[in-house]
Every structure is written in C-alpha cells, then in structure tokens.
C-alpha cells in the first residue's frame, strides 16, 4: 500500500514524463495537418481526387495526432514501471481512444497500466522464468488487465466525459472564453514552464485533440509572451537592466519567438516581485486579445513559429504584441519605481549621517 501511495504522490512527475515525450507528435502532426489544410485553400480536408498529395500530407498529420494518445500513456507507464509498462499502457490508451476517451483516456490508461505492471514485477517467480517475465509474461498480462479495464469498464464513460468537455468548449460564449483566457494566461506565465504552466499546456493539448483551435491560440499566445515581453523590456528600458540581463534579453526574444516560456526564468529569478506579476498581466492581456479577435492555431505549440498554421494571423500577431508591450511597460515601471525608492532611501540615510556628524 505504501508503494501505491508513493506512486500516486508522484503522479505529476509521471504525467510530465508522458507529456514531454508526447510533444513531438503533437507539434509535427498538428503542423503537417494544418499546412495541408492551409495549402488546399478551402478551409477543409483536402480532397483525395482533387489534390492527392495534400490529402496524403493531411493523413500524415492525422497519424501524428493519433499516435500522441498511446505514446502519452506509454511514457506515463514507463515513468512508473519502466520498459515493461510501455505496451500495456499504449494498447490500453488505444482501446480507450476507440471510445473517444482521447487525452483523458491516455492519462487513466497510463496510470493504471503503470501500477498494474509495477505490481506484476513484484510477483516472486522461479529463476528460470525471470528472464521471460519482462518481455513475455508481464506485457501480456499487463495488456490484458489494462486494455480490459478500458474496454469493459472506463473507456465508454471517459469517452462520454471527453465528448461533453468538447461540446462545452465549442459552445462557449465570448464572456466564458475571455474568463478562460484570463485563467490560462495566469497559469502559463506564473511559473514559466513549471507544474502550473504544464497543467495549462496539457489543457491546450486536449483542445488540439478535440479540435477546439480558438483555445489553442489563446494558449499559444500566452506561452510566448513572458520571454518576448522581458526581451522587449531590456530594449526599451536599458537602464533598468544590467549588461548581462540585456544580453539575456536578446536570447529571450528568440526563445519567445519559438514558444519557449522558460526564456523569462533568468529575469524572474533575479527580481521575482516585479517580473512575475508583470509577465502574468502581460500574458492575460495577450490571451484575452487572442480570444476577442477569434484567432485559431492548429498546432500544439506557441510563439511566432506557428504563425504559418494560424488562422487570423493579424489578430494573433496583435495579441502577442499587446501582451509583450504590456509586460515590458509593467516591468520597467516597477523597476523604475524601485530605483527611485532606493535612491530616496539612500539620500535620507546620507542626510541622517550628515546630521549625526554635525551634531
């Protein structure tokens, strides 16, 4: 029981392992799919007769997005029980996906499969059987249990839950989607690639899988604003930053363009009280702008690098610009106030010293 509790305590770590291994499938599949639709020029799936090559490119993209579900589950299981859990979790997630369980089904299959395999590995066996357990017995039994649970137990209800979430997201009114944008902007900027950021990113991936591309665009904007905003801040308020920070700002601009939120971490580590609130406000402003203009992003990533697969490019660029400018202005204002307060304090201390010497 203690082992089970420990596994569940480390759930976040297991989920992050799965998500990190899934990202290449999301990015490559999503971008190839979006490129095929964009080149077709009709906002629809390319027709196999009219343009067979674009249809094949579309199918490659679909393959990438389809594989993200079993690979997510496989590496969640791998984090829990290592190699023997790969097949049971991947197959369990595939079975769950046949019911429409999608991302949630992968999470459940990965955790269940990992736990099942973990305990199967604990069963004492004769030394003759030890060599075949990890490559024969455990994968078969683990797959039967995990896939069986998804097939006859959890697959259908989880699929219904996923479908309900999709309908809710697609039916959101403007007020609701603005509130969602506020929440996602705050979460994405708060710890810049940490656990809170990853929760929001996982929600973005759910939206990719379910085709809710407006929410994907909101997250894509929120992801890139912290580094872009801090890079811009070093350009317009040079006196508020050291020479080293100004050099870091150049790297942050590049990282923001390619959707790496962690580019803002050096600034937040040096001055968290002024940087973190600024990037959170900026990300919220950018995310809300993206929601209001109705931009859509077809790839599960952020920054300007995904611009070719964005619908409503001008609105998307405007949202990024709004967020970056707000961040840069906020952080420079706060730093300027801090410098002035620091100077005033120093002057008062000098006056006190002078008075003391005269007296």
From Swiss-Prot:
Principal location listed in the UniProt entry: membrane
Membrane-related topology note: Multi-pass membrane protein
Signal peptide feature range: none
Protein's name according to its UniProt entry: Fructose-like permease IIC component 2
Matches recorded under NCBIfam families: PRK10478.1, PTS_IIC_fructo
Domain-related comment: The EIIC domain forms the PTS system translocation channel and contains the specific substrate-binding site.
InterPro entries: Bacterial_PTS_Sugar_Transport (IPR050864), PTS_EIIC_2 (IPR013014), PTS_IIC_fruc (IPR006327)
Transmembrane segments: 19-39, 60-80, 99-119, 135-155, 176-196, 216-236, 251-271, 290-310, 314-334
UniProt subcellular location: Cell inner membrane
PROSITE patterns assigned: PTS_EIIC_TYPE_2
Annotated PTS EIIC type-2 domain residues: 11-344
UniProt organism field: Escherichia coli (strain K12)
Keyword Transmembrane: yes
Cellular component, GO, one term: plasma membrane
Task performed by this protein: The phosphoenolpyruvate-dependent sugar phosphotransferase system (PTS), a major carbohydrate active -transport system, catalyzes the phosphorylation of incoming sugar substrates concomitant with their translocation across the cell membrane.
A GO term for molecular function: protein-N(PI)-phosphohistidine-sugar phosphotransferase activity
GO annotation terms (biological process): fructose import across plasma membrane; phosphoenolpyruvate-dependent sugar phosphotransferase system
């Amino acid at each position: 029981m203690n082992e089970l509790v420990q596994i569940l305590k480390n759930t976040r770590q297991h989920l992050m392992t799965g998500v990190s291994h899934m990202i290449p499938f999301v990015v490559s599949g999503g971008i190839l799919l979006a490129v095929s639709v964009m080149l077709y020029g009709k906002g629809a799936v390319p027709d196999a007769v009219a343009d067979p090559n674009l249809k094949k490119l579309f199918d490659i993209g679909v393959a990438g997005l389809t594989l993200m579900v079993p690979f997510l589950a496989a590496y969640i299981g791998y984090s829990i029980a290592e190699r023997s859990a790969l097949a049971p979790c991947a197959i369990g997630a595939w079975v769950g996906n046949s019911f429409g369980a999608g991302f949630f089904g992968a999470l459940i299959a990965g955790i269940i499969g990992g736990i099942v395999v973990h305990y199967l590995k604990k069963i004492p066996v004769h030394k003759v059987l030890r060599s075949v357990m990890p490559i024969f017995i455990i994968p078969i039994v683990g797959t039967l249990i995990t896939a069986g649970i998804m097939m006859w137990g959890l697959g259908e209800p989880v699929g219904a839950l996923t479908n309900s979430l999709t309908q809710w997201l697609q039916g959101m009114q403007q007020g609701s989607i603005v509130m969602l944008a506020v929440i996602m902007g705050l979460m994405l900027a708060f710890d810049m690639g940490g656990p809170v950021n990853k929760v929001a990113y996982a929600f973005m991936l759910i939206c990719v899988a379910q085709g809710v591309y407006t929410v994907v665009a909101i997250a894509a904007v929120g992801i890139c604003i912290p580094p872009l905003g801090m890079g811009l801040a070093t350009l317009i308020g040079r006196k508020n930053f050291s020479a080293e920070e100004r050099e870091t700002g150049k790297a942050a601009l590049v990282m923001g363009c390619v959707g790496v939120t962690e580019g803002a971490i050096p600034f937040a580590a040096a001055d968290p009280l002024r940087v973190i609130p600024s990037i959170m406000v900026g990300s919220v402003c950018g995310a809300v702008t993206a929601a209001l203009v109705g931009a859509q992003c077809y790839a599960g990533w952020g920054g300007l690098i995904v611009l070719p697969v964005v619908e409503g490019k001008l609105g998307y660029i405007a949202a990024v610009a709004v967020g970056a400018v707000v961040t840069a202005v906020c952080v420079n204002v706060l730093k300027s106030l801090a410098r002035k307060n620091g100077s005033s304090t120093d002057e008062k201390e000098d006056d006190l010293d002078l008075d003391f010497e005269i007296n």
